[in-house]
Curated annotation (Swiss-Prot):
Transmembrane segments: 9-29, 37-57, 69-89, 123-143, 153-173, 184-204, 216-236, 246-266
Top-level taxon of the source organism: Bacteria
Entry keyword annotation includes Plastid: no
Annotated protein name in UniProt: Uncharacterized protein HI_1241
Entry keyword set: Cell membrane, Membrane, Transmembrane, Transmembrane helix
Intracellular or extracellular location(s): Cell membrane
One GO cellular component term: plasma membrane
Keyword Zinc annotated: no
Primary location: membrane
Membrane-protein topology: Multi-pass membrane protein
Gene source species: Haemophilus influenzae (strain ATCC 51907 / DSM 11121 / KW20 / Rd)
Length: 266
């Protein structure tokens, strides 16, 4: 495969991955009876950007790897631009605006990072602070939601999606930090367990009354089956000492970003 063809395929995969996240997020938004202009998966995209910033800041990567990772990260602008537009068309959604602007700002800082290491590191630290502000905006919106909405907006699920997305981004960009990439599946397993535990406690303490009809029971069954599927894929790759391929990561990402979708039906 020629270098030019490889670049086109990488660009296509990058656009496809963020488009899948955006498409499912917008589908969830369209299903809501009471429109809450808050991206369910926004904090996950911010987490993916933060992991990319960590690679830029601490990773010993060559200019070629840096350039490829910058190009892949630029596709995140699609997600944030769409959500900023949606938020601006609604009323009284300032925190979502802030979150979207923070996401776009991180894309800009990554794109324009200087070549001089000292200045570049300052640039990247500023971008990390902005991403942190975006996560804080998400947290502020989350704390204003009623307790009954926890299942749908549970932050562990989108954070899990963000780690998977970051892994996919690094693979698409052909990053060679194999030691760091090998740690990401472990983070996925931990987040998957935390998400399952949080949902189990929610059901135990607050949500049993929501699981009385067949539609809710079916949604919860699919939700937890998805956990087993993700865990099975990760454990199989771990036992066989396989690295997560692009195809495997796309499957994992699709399952993970659909987790909040099932909770809309509860």
């Amino acid at each position: 495969m020629s270098e030019q063809s490889s670049k086109y395929i990488a660009a296509l995969l990058a656009v496809l991955s963020i488009s899948m996240v955006l498409g499912i997020d917008l589908f969830i938004f369209s299903l809501q009876s009471e429109k809450q202009t808050m991206p369910h998966l926004g904090v996950g995209v911010l987490v993916a950007q933060l992991i990319s910033l960590l690679v830029f800041y601490r990773g010993e990567i060559c200019p070629g790897q840096r350039g490829r990772l910058i190009k892949v990260n630029m596709t995140f602008a699609i997600y944030w631009a769409v959500w900023l537009l949606i938020s601006l068309l609604q009323n009284n959604h300032t925190l979502t605006n802030v979150m979207s602007v923070c996401g776009l700002s991180v894309v800009y800082f990554i794109w324009k990072q200087p070549k001089t290491e000292k200045i570049r590191n300052s640039f990247l630290l500023m971008a990390a602070l902005i991403a942190g502000l975006g996560c804080l905006s998400y947290l502020m919106i989350f704390t204003e939601l009623p307790a009954s909405d926890f299942a749908e907006y549970n932050p562990f699920a989108p954070i899990l999606s963000g780690v998977i997305l970051a892994n996919l981004v690094l693979v698409i960009a052909r990053n060679r930090l194999q030691g760091f990439i090998a740690l990401l599946p472990l983070a996925m397993i931990i987040l998957l367990a935390l998400n399952a535990l949080a949902m189990f406690l929610f059901l135990l303490l607050n949500g049993m009354e929501s699981a009385v009809n067949s539609e809710s029971v079916f949604a919860y069954i699919i939700y937890f089956v998805c956990h087993f599927v993700i865990a099975a894929i990760l454990i199989l790759h771990s036992f066989q000492k396989w690295t997560l391929s692009t195809n495997s990561l796309f499957i994992l990402l699709f399952i993970a970003v659909c987790l909040p979708l099932w909770m809309v039906f509860v």
